[in-house]
Structure formats: structure tokens, C-alpha cells
């Protein structure tokens, strides 16, 4: 039986869409470093859950976990990566930015809304995080836990996230935190109006390979669903 979960994996993509290609100056390595490296492997759980959504588009080009009007350096269409590397030789004109949103951003958000009504009890926005904070992000240079679960602004019931933390702590030997260093993002805050949501951040530190991390994530999620009944 599939787990009654909706998994969102918004930052696993590596593709620069054609609308942005004439402007983007990032190398493939820089694009990968700005995204959630390892997420495509760790969260390859589509066959295990009721609903699943991901994208091939790189986070550096369209960040699906930002508000559509967030036009800062690390906003929905970025000027710089999380390593403070310029994304574009010259920033795309307004019509190109709007095309990126219409073609890649809004369809993702609409699909999450549609999937929320598909017999799921919890949405999980799945990410990987650097072992230490990058220059642009919470806690630059600070060591991070193995797992961070977030429900900032009450995106899921507190007893749920506490029991979810316990399930992750049972299978991961390293620290599992709630709302530290992350407190959730646009996806969890916005779509919590439709369904309870949590944000899941798994460290990229090499304490396990991707397959082992995937198995532990699946085990923790399965145990949590069993505990909820």
C-alpha cells in the first residue's frame, strides 16, 4: 500500500530552460551546486507514495520555493546563486521572467494544489542542505544537523512534526531538529491552506550514500504513517 503522502521535490532539477539559455552564464557544476544535490536519488520515492511532484528545471533559474513577487538576489528568478555567483551576464528582460513563471513556476504550484485532494494526509517538501551554511542562507559556515524538519507558521500540527522527528531520530544516528536552521518555505506556508505540510531537509554530508539515505527516509516516513494510523 502506498503511503498517504504528497512529496514535492522542487530543487532537484539541473536544466536551463530555453527561455533563459541566452542569458545564463552558469556552468553545469555551478548549477548543480546551487540546487539540492542528491535530492533526485534520495527522494526517488514516487512508487511509494500516493502523490509526487518534481521538476527538471534548475533552482538557479526558477526557484519554486519562493513567492512569485520575490525579486531579490535569491528570489524566484535569481540574480546570484547561494554561493553569490552571478547567474546572468545581464538579467533577462521582464517578458522573459514572466515566461519563466508562466511555463515552470505556476504549473508546479497548481499541480501541488490539485494533488492535495488526492487522498493524502500530509505534504512533505523534500530538500537536501549543505553540511555547513553557504554564504547566502541561514547560518553561513555553521554546522547543520543531519535532518531538519520545519513547520514554521504552523503548517502542520505540532504533535505531528514532533512524532515525525522521533521517527527520523530512530533511524538516523545524527541530530534531527525542528525549525533549525530552516523554518519552512513558500511551498509549505502557501499550500498548508490546502493540506498540512512539513519541509524536510537532509544533510549532504557523506555519512551515508544516497541509496542508504533514501532507505532511511522511506523507513521514517513509513513508521510515521503507521503511527498516525
Q: Where are the regions that the model predicts?
A:
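N-terminal catalytic or cofactor-binding beta/alpha core of small enzyme domains
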Residues: 1-229
Amino acid at each position: 500500500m502506498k503511503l498517504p503522502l504528497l512529496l514535492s521535490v522542487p530543487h532537484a532539477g539541473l536544466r536551463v530552460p530555453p527561455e533563459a539559455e541566452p542569458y545564463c552564464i552558469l556552468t553545469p557544476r555551478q548549477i548543480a551546486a546551487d540546487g539540492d544535490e542528491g535530492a533526485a536519488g534520495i527522494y526517488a520515492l514516487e512508487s511509494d507514495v500516493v502523490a509526487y511532484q518534481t521538476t527538471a528545471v534548475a533552482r538557479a533559474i526558477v526557484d519554486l520555493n519562493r513567492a512569485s513577487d520575490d525579486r531579490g538576489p535569491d528570489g524566484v528568478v535569481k540574480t546570484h546563486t547561494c554561493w553569490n555567483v552571478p547567474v546572468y551576464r545581464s538579467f533577462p528582460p521582464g517578458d522573459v521572467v514572466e515566461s519563466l513563471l508562466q511555463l515552470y513556476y505556476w504549473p508546479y504550484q497548481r499541480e501541488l494544489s490539485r494533488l492535495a485532494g488526492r487522498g493524502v494526509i500530509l505534504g512533505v517538501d523534500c530538500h537536501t542542505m549543505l553540511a555547513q551554511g553557504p554564504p547566502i542562507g541561514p547560518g553561513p559556515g555553521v554546522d547543520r544537523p543531519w535532518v531538519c524538519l520545519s513547520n514554521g507558521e504552523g503548517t502542520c500540527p505540532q504533535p505531528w512534526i514532533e512524532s515525525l522527528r522521533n521517527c527520523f531520530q530512530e533511524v538516523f544516528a545524527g541530530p534531527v531538529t525542528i525549525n533549525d536552521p530552516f523554518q519552512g518555505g513558500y511551498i509549505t506556508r502557501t499550500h498548508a491552506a490546502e493540506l498540512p505540510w512539513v519541509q524536510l531537509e537532509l544533510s549532504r554530508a557523506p555519512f551515508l550514500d544516497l541509496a542508504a539515505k533514501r532507505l532511511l527516509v522511506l523507513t521514517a516516513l513509513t513508521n510515521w504513517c503507521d503511527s498516525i494510523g
